[in-house]
Amino acid sequence: PIRLKMGQQTAGKTFLNLFAYTCSASVHAALGGAIETVSVDLSNTYLNWGKRNFALNGIAETHHHFIEADVMAWLGQCQEKFDVIFIDPPTFSNSKKMQDVFDVQRDHVELITLAMRLLNPNGICYFSTNFRRFQLDEDSMRYLQLKEISPGTIGFDYKRNMRIHRCWQVSPKEQ
């Protein structure tokens, strides 16, 4: 699964987990040696679950941060840079805590664009979705290198249905 990749690619790096849910990708990043993780989610309940997951894995919160926020609004304000960014948004959200309704099909270009602004040079971003009818708008992101890596990110117990989720590696195009 993709969260295992986070553990393999984050040693000595900073890691941002957007729509973090229970922070499993952040746990894997921390166990893989990330020097800092930042997990952002709208739900304090899920972030508290994430904190428990860190504790259960023996990881102190010292360099691992949990931010309750509307991801889109937070991305517009954040100034920190990260080496690895993981984006796993819901298909749809209309929470009262958000500034706007979120729709992954409609909003993914803006989401990825905002996240890429926070990526360090030579950094890497991963965008994942479980929306089965999702179509990546490559034309609107021609300035990025987009590589679909879905087959390598699906756990063995889900191999029978390769459309269970889709995942892309996103990086700036080589100049």
Predicted features by range, described:
Residues 36-41:
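Conserved SAM-binding motif I beta-strand of class I
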